[in-house]
């Protein structure tokens, strides 16, 4: 089964009305290989609706966070139904900044992932280890623990993309080598085969996130288990276009 390449741009808490206009104009006017590469941007909440209205339709728009309840007294949270109502069809869950800064547990991330899927969103579920965990040779144990938490609550994996993002390589300028990324991605695929079945594992997209930029993205293409990228800072710049078009660089 051919897995469609996936490139996501996580804008984090960056951007202004003016800069978003520039970013959207660039996406709309640049020839991007969106037919072969599923391309999704994740702006701040403030700009979700205007982005969806203004960016071309073959580019997806997603939220950076979602809650695990339909509605109610949950000040500051995103409702999956409200996102869908606004034309937003993707969300991130479990980003390392949510796990570390906001203390989101594996179980909470799994609950949010489950609920978002049930409401009809496509979920990019983020997993990854800290530098201390990598140095203690705990990388695989950590990502398997995080994956098991999701698998305990989710049966249908057809609308999940797994983003492996080593925490030590996010916003630091450090990047896992393509070989390091492939090693973990292969272990994720092996886990999926054993836990979810061979056909689910073969169709599951596992993308890499961690200081990906226009200069290093092509190096990852030679590895079969790397199905795309979750891009941070570079997604705010024109080089994001090169990452989307990585196959023709």
Curated annotation (Swiss-Prot):
The active site is at residues 95, 165. Keywords: Gluconeogenesis, Glycolysis, Isomerase, Phosphoprotein. InterPro entries: Aldolase_TIM, TIM_sf, TrioseP_Isoase_bac/euk, Triosephosphate_isomerase, Triosephosphate_isomerase_AS. The keyword Phosphoprotein applies. It is an enzyme of class 5 (isomerase). GO terms for cellular component: cytosol. Substrate binds at residues 10, 12. It catalyses: D-glyceraldehyde 3-phosphate = dihydroxyacetone phosphate. One of its GO terms (biological process) is glycolytic process. This is Triosephosphate isomerase. The modification Phosphoserine is found at residues 105, 199. Belongs to the triosephosphate isomerase family. Homodimer. It comes from Schizosaccharomyces pombe (strain 972 / ATCC 24843). Its EC number is 5.3.1.1. GO terms for molecular function: triose-phosphate isomerase activity. The lineage of its organism: Eukaryota, Fungi, Dikarya, Ascomycota, Taphrinomycotina. Pathway: Carbohydrate biosynthesis; gluconeogenesis; Carbohydrate degradation; glycolysis; D-glyceraldehyde 3-phosphate from glycerone phosphate: step 1/1. The gene is tpi1. Pfam families: TIM (PF00121).
């Amino acid at each position: 089964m051919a897995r469609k390449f996936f490139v996501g741009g996580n804008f984090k808490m960056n951007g202004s009305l003016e800069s978003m206009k520039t970013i959207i104009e660039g996406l709309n006017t640049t020839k991007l290989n969106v037919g072969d590469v599923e391309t999704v941007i994740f702006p701040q909440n403030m700009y979700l609706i205007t982005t969806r209205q203004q960016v071309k339709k073959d580019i997806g728009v997603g939220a950076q966070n979602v809650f695990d309840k339909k509605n109610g007294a949950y000040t500051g949270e995103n409702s999956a139904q409200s996102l869908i109502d606004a034309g937003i069809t993707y969300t991130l869950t479990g980003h390392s900044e949510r796990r570390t800064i906001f203390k989101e547990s594996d179980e909470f991330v799994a609950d949010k992932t489950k609920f978002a899927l049930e409401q009809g969103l496509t979920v990019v579920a983020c997993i990854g280890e800290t530098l201390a965990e990598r140095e203690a040779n705990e990388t695989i144990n950590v990502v398997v623990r995080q994956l098991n938490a999701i698998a305990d609550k989710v049966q249908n994996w057809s609308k999940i993309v797994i983003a492996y993002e080593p925490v030590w390589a996010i916003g630091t300028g450090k990047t896992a080598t393509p070989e390091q990324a492939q090693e973990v991605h292969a272990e994720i695929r092996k886990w999926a085969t054993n836990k979810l079945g061979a056909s689910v594992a073969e169709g599951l997209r596992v993308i890499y996130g961690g200081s990906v930029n226009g200069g290093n993205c092509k190096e990852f293409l030679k590895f079969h288990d790397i199905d795309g990228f979750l891009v941070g800072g570079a997604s705010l710049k024109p080089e994001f276009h090169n990452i989307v078009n990585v196959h023709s660089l």
